[in-house]
C-alpha cells in the first residue's frame, strides 16, 4: 500500500480523465489500483474516472474482470459466423493465463469450444483432454490466489504436458 501511495505522489501530475487513464497489469490488480485511486482522491479531491480496474466500491465496472476476455470471443464468433461456423467442438489455443486469458477460456467453454493450452512467461501447458471448467477453476485459483506458475497445472493433471520457454502456437488446433 505504501508503495502505491508514494508512486501516486509523482504520477498524479501526469494522469487525469482527459490525459491518461492507467490500468492494472501483471502483478497490479484491483487492490493496488484501489490504493492508487485512494491516494489520487486524497491529493486532488476528485472522484473522477482516472483509473480502470477499480473495485465496485470505487466506481469500477461490474463486469470489468470478464470484459476483455469475453469480447475476444465475441469478436471470434463474428469472424466464424462469416465462415458459416461456430466454436462447438473446436480446439482452441490460448496464450496467457492472466485475467484476459482466463475469461477468454471461460467464454470458449460456454460456447462449446475445447481449450487446449494456456501459458505464462515461463512456458505453456497443453492438455490433450482439454481444459474444462474444473481445470480452469484450478488455473484461476493457482494464478489469482496463489500467484503460481502454469507449470503446476501439469503436476496436478498428469496427462497434460508442460513446455518450458515456448509459446503454444505450434500445437495442433482449429483456432
Model-found features: residue ranges?
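Glycine/serine-rich phosphate-binding loop and adjoining beta1-alpha1 elements at the start
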Residues: 1-88
Amino acid at each position: 500500500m505504501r508503495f502505491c501511495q508514494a508512486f501516486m505522489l509523482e504520477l498524479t501530475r501526469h494522469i487525469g480523465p482527459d490525459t491518461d487513464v492507467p490500468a492494472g497489469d501483471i502483478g497490479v490488480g484491483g487492490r493496488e489500483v484501489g490504493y492508487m485511486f485512494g491516494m489520487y482522491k486524497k491529493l486532488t479531491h476528485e472522484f473522477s474516472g482516472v483509473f480502470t480496474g477499480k473495485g465496485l466500491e470505487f466506481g469500477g465496472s461490474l463486469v470489468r474482470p470478464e470484459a476483455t476476455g469475453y469480447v475476444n470471443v465475441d469478436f471470434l464468433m463474428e469472424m466464424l459466423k462469416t465462415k458459416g461456423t461456430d466454436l462447438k467442438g473446436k480446439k482452441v489455443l490460448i496464450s496467457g493465463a492472466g485475467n484476459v486469458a482466463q475469461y477468454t477460456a471461460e467464454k470458449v467453454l460456454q460456447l462449446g469450444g475445447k481449450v487446449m493450452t494456456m501459458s505464462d512467461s515461463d512456458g505453456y501447458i497443453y492438455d490433450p483432454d482439454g481444459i474444462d471448467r474444473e481445470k480452469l477453476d484450478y488455473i484461476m485459483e493457482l494464478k489469482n490466489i496463489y500467484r503460481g506458475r502454469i507449470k503446476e497445472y501439469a503436476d496436478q493433471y498428469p496427462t497434460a504436458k508442460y513446455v518450458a520457454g515456448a509459446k503454444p502456437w505450434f500445437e495442433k488446433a482449429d483456432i
